[in-house]
Amino acid sequence: IRPLLPQRADTVVGPGDDCAVVRVAGSADDWLFTTDPVIERRHFLPETPPRLVGRKAIARAVSDVAAMGGTPLWILVDLVAPAATPLARIRGLYAGLIAAAEKWNLGILGGDTAEGDTLELHITGVGRLPRGSAVLRSGARAGNFVYVTGALGGAYLPGSRHHLLFEPRLEAGRFLAQHKFATAMMDLSDGLAADLPRLLDASRRG
């Protein structure tokens, strides 16, 4: 898909990183844009508490912004749900969304709703960071060490809720970006084994 998409002059980083980076003339900041789906039976189970589904949806977008070294500011929420979805379940989803937005100081600007065969949340996140300071996937160099900011494999432990309750590494991302300690960063929501080759590919080091 990526080669099919035209790029504008104000797009610093387009498809292929954790966030797109857009530069607005006269602004001291660059702007970050990301979008993430959370789909039933793909990212959560029917029996997953809806509040945790809402939290996970926002945490994924926040984690993308953290991986660039930025600060998340706003989100848009699209809900797709079967017509028979109980209202209590919808309320639970939004209770989780609202609690997560408050936790990470995000404004919920709105969104859209649609009827569909599967319960889905689609989050669009907007953030910012100082102009020119984004840490990209494409910056890895020969001889770099690979570090992670948390424990690996937690989502695979029996009964684990790590994939629902993980904490985006906002402070670590900003610190690493501000002090230029990292040449490349990325979110590891798909696991190190899946994501490290993507970083190497983006950096042409694979």
Briefly describe each language-model feature range.
Residues 1-206:
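Helix-biased detector of long, well-ordered alpha-helical tracts
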